[in-house]
Amino acid sequence: MTNLGHNHPIAMKNRSVPVDTVLPHVAYRDLPTAIDWLVKHFGFVEQYHYVDTTTGKIAGAQLRLANAYIMAHASKANASTPAELGYSLQSLTIFFDDVDAHHRKVKSTGIRLVEQLHQTVYGELQYAVQDLEGHLWIFSQHAKDLSPDEWGAKITR
């Protein structure tokens, strides 16, 4: 096992951090409200949260939806939300086995869809919404197995 000169091997396991390839960290101005909103509207399950010992406020939480995990944390006081900026700099995509069912649940909460449920040219069935602070979320399901060159992309590897 490689350790690259550190005291900890790279393949170390940590039950507090899932083994996803990427663990997105999403900042919210009102973190407790955001956690409740993500649970209610998207179906996330809160795994744990932790408190800032100086303020006594929730500082971060790990949330899970299907096989995806995120860390939600409190933003800095002077940080703007995507909603305040009028745009989001990135999106988060979560994959489902049944995106239709998730789409029906999300629509039933009254959220405005940014992108209606549709099949993409690259073989995904997906839709998109913005959360309460303007972060862009895409919910997707593999609908077809397509090679990138089948829909016009140039394979470069």
Sequence positions of predicted segments:
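Vicinal oxygen chelate
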Residues: 2-25, 35-36, 42-97, 103-130, ...
